[in-house]
Swiss-Prot record:
Compartments, record wording: Virion membrane; Host Golgi apparatus membrane
Organism: Feline coronavirus (strain FIPV WSU-79/1146) (FCoV)
Segments crossing the lipid bilayer: 48-68, 78-98, 113-133
Predominant localisation class: virion
UniProt keyword annotations, A-Z: Glycoprotein, Host Golgi apparatus, Host membrane, Membrane, Transmembrane, Transmembrane helix, Viral envelope protein, Viral matrix protein, Virion
Residues carrying covalently attached carbohydrate according to the record: N32
GO MF term (any one): structural constituent of virion
Protein name, UniProt field: Membrane protein
Amino acid sequence: MKYILLILACIIACVYGERYCAMQDSGLQCINGTNSRCQTCFERGDLIWHLANWNFSWSVILIVFITVLQYGRPQFSWLVYGIKMLIMWLLWPIVLALTIFNAYSEYQVSRYVMFGFSVAGAVVTFALWMMYFVRSVQLYRRTKSWWSFNPETNAILCVNALGRSYVLPLDGTPTGVTLTLLSGNLYAEGFKMAGGLTIEHLPKYVMIATPSRTIVYTLVGKQLKATTATGWAYYVKSKAGDYSTEARTDNLSEHEKLLHMV
């Protein structure tokens, strides 16, 4: 594949101008004429020249990038998932810095059209970055969970049991929620949320918080085996509003706990 790219580069770039040639017995050198020993040649500063010299490095970088994107999930590896989150957090400030630097460099050489595009890119990048922070703060306000600042988190499932609030990040808001109890361990969406629970500890309602509202899911059915603390409970949407998902331990009724506002 490397030689195919180099041959194509030679065909495109050798038509005119000063050329670089990849020699059989020497490194890259600039020549002004045709040399029979030249395998491939290409125009100085061309993208193909960059690929010809850095294709292996870029292939390694892209392999790592694809691996992080493909397997950057908690069920595969928390380490890879952490690297993925770090990359996503750093992309916004890096892109913003690049657009600002490009705007400055274009202004210095009086290329005002590109300067305008660079400024527009910087403004859009900054606006999108601020939108991420606003939505994350809104979600944190409802859940008090640091999962709110995960770039992939669009909603958070909150289950109150034993006076604590157990959370699980979600991609969206489902129609129903199923909680599974296996030998005292509570699971949702295939992930373990809590341990040491019994049938009596399963709540009458669960909540899913989004940046704009909190959706309450009410228990409509369950099947449990008391001897092994195993079973399931199913919840469906019942109402939505500006509710907090924090667990309450004071002397309030179930209805009051449900409706206490942020």
